[in-house]
Amino acid sequence: MKKVNKKTVGSVGEKIAAQYLSKKGYKILEKNFKCKIGEIDLIALYKNQIVFVEVKTRTSVNFGLPSEAVDFHKQQKIVKIAQVYIASSNFKQYQPRFDIIEVYLNPEKLTLEKVNHILNAF
């Protein structure tokens, strides 16, 4: 089995997650939003909510589920970044929501095997 680049796996997963959300009726506002605190993979509007999405992509579950990588520290960081985004945007009236999307890829071809969307993950 060939070794796959983590950055490539991550970017493939984020692209798949954005397409998945778009098909479900979400309007993608930002991809890889960055500020001094860090980065949020996807920011989207859905009905009356502004949704902040952490995408975790894996080619194997040998080291645990993708969502397990979003620990309390990571969650707190995402919340702080979301606060920065909301404060500097026109979306203050929207209810914030924090989701995780797990993307499972075939380790050989990096093709989609499964998407698991965890709503209100934290």
UniProtKB/Swiss-Prot annotation:
Pfam families in UniProt: UPF0102 (PF02021)
Domain of life per record: Bacteria
MF terms (GO), sorted A to Z: nucleic acid binding
UniProt cross-references to SUPFAM superfamilies, sorted A to Z: Restriction endonuclease-like
Family according to the record: Belongs to the UPF0102 family.
The name this protein goes by in its record: UPF0102 protein TTE1452
Organism field: Caldanaerobacter subterraneus subsp. tengcongensis (strain DSM 15242 / JCM 11007 / NBRC 100824 / MB4) (Thermoanaerobacter tengcongensis)
